Amino acid sequence: AQNLKFGYVNYTELVQLVPEMDTVREQLEAQEKETYETLGAMYQEYQTKAEQFQQKQSTWTPAIRDSKMKELQEIEARFQENQQIFQQELQQMQQMLQAPVMEKVQNTVAELAKAQGLAFVFEETQMLYIDPAQGVNLTTEARKALNIPEDRTLESLQAELQAKAQAAQAQM
């Protein structure tokens, strides 16, 4: 029986920490901000018309009241439709921007695996058990090849993202 060598890697860590992912996150944040501003303006329009409706409905004829109610319902429907469309567009943009980053990580792992004669590489976080003596952990080597700073971790990234979110919240 042929002895197959295997490797394992923390793919999630590599994808999240690779420097190119920072650019992806920035582009997505900018798009999200623009989207929320657009939706906010639409919601404000709805709120204004709803308040006007509440204040003036008693003075309107039934025909005008029905017309204004229909207009409100159309604005609400347009808002909900745009909300769904924007969400889909953001997801598509995320997939499009992340694809080359994920491909780069996969190619890097594949090159490292081939160089070490590994038959296959597992995603470390998806395995119930890995005996380190039996396999090769490629995460550290891949981090170096992908120019991920040694001190950058998922925890430090999470803290960085939370700090950014809090700073953005404070500006609102």
Located regions from the model:
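Amphipathic, charged alpha-helical segments and their helix-to-coil junctions
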Residues: 1-172
